[in-house]
Amino acid sequence: NGKLCPKGYLGAYLLYDPDRFKGPMKRTNPKKGRNEVPKFVPVSWDEALNTVAARLQALRDKGESHRFALLYGRGWGASDAGLQGTFGRLYGTPNGSVGHSSTCADASKKAKRVLDGNYDYNAYDYANTNYMLIFGASFLEAFRPYNHNLQVWGHIRTKSPKTKVTAVDVHWNTTIAAADRALLIRPGTDGALALAIAHVIMTEGLWDRNFVGDFKDGVNRFKVGAATLKPEDFNEKWTKGLIEWWNVELKDRTPKWAEKITSIAERDIVVVARELATTKPAMVLFERGPT
């Protein structure tokens, strides 16, 4: 829309940020966990490089060089990526060049290619949604198209009715701070949360019958602890394999089960599931890697 992304203007803030790393940092607290402070302290480049070299040599001496992985982020040129891959082969690991795309949005493209043959990113009608459930998508930090997202955010958060936002992530960030509800989740457990949300929608009869279909007699048989359901008892419309999915995976994935895995309270999972199912139109965002 003829606007420039504000990231360029804000770049100076990164340069002069008092918390910006100016060199190597070493962790001094060996204990790890959500409530542990790592206690990083600055060290010299000589100490940092010698430490890394010693650990790499120790792995190779034990015949375990394959346990080393080298990950790099966005912005590396082709020559840099090639150098990293060569380093991995010389060292003796197949994990020597794990790039940004491997851990970010390319997973969504590959998933879409398997599902519908479209090897591209999703497009969303942000302007007309009334509910957004965001799974670690970094909507206000880096989600594409970033400039458009900032513009549409102002619209959806000031229109009537105001778009309600629930954000799921592993750390406090801009999107979490701006959302109506923040769910801080244990890393890598997004799937458990999604299953529990779906479980609530099915057991409470909140699914979209015009799109999904319904039981032939209109009686909801999605119940906790229910026996295996028969696919022929359900008139399925635009989805495929719902009953099989329930039988194999979904029937025991309660919010109580998910709470132990995700660290998100059972009551919060139930509330989000109900909001998502009853606020129309609604959308679920993901893409930039699992949280």
Predicted features along the sequence, with ranges:
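N-terminal export/assembly segments and adjacent metallocofactor-ligating motifs
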Residues: 1-207, 218, 257, 265-268
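Domain-level signature for respiratory redox metalloenzymes
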Residues: 183, 187-291
